[in-house]
Amino acid sequence: MSQIESQNPEPVFQLKGSMLAITVMELARTNLEALDRQLAAKVAQAPNFFSNTPLILALDKLAPNEGPVDLPGLVRICRQHGLRTLAIRANRIEDIAAAIAVDLPVLPPSGARERVIDPVEAEAPKKIPEKPPEPLIKPTRVITAPVRGGQQIYAQGGDLVVVAPVSPGAELLADGNIHVYGPMRGRALAGIKGDTKARIFCQQLSAELISIAGQYKVSEDLRRDPLWGSPVQISLSGDVLNIIRL
């Protein structure tokens, strides 16, 4: 390191905390054979959705009398189906110990909104000129052309409006709401940064997948709904997606 650099070091990294919409798998039983079969069936319905998907394994819903979890085996099965385990949630001592043994972080129940973490919090910050705050809501993104299979459209910081058909294999993502004024045959993921008040509106529900703030339903579940093929509004209550007629 040069003398000049040591006298006036510039930071080369920044630590941040964040709240992201990450898929959470809540384990109800420790039967890994059944999990492997059921997970394979889910992946077959929407293979792209499960490709390299970050995952939190939630073991805190397991009954106290449920047997021990083969955590390495569980992580291996998830990885085989495209799910990349980042951490676990657990409250049983044996599950926490198993996570520590394989060097997996154990998370608290909830996260924090993104902010810069300053390790030297005791030092009084120097006053610097503040930049004008960026608007929280960005303009609505409007798409007028058909969205074809393989296309991905993202409305960052706001809503997405599509006034054309959405083909199978196409993917719509928005931090806010999604409106589709035409047949919705692809995937629609609203509130992808954790906005649980986001909604999805479409004139014809024929989607491969719908998701709000990480809670999702695939086409196999949607086809059983009596409003399949109808104009609908989709909202989230707790961890339940509600579908009602427009």
UniProtKB/Swiss-Prot annotation:
InterPro entries the UniProt entry points to: CAP/MinC_C, MinC, MinC_C_sf, MinC_N, Septum_form_inhib_MinC_C
Gene3D superfamilies per record: 2.160.20.70, 3.30.70.260
Top-level lineage group: Bacteria
GO BP, sorted A to Z: cell morphogenesis; division septum assembly; regulation of cell division; regulation of cell septum assembly
Alphabetical list of Pfam families matching this protein: MinC_C, MinC_N
Family: Belongs to the MinC family.
Protein name as catalogued: Probable septum site-determining protein MinC
Taxonomic source organism: Pseudomonas syringae pv. syringae (strain B728a)
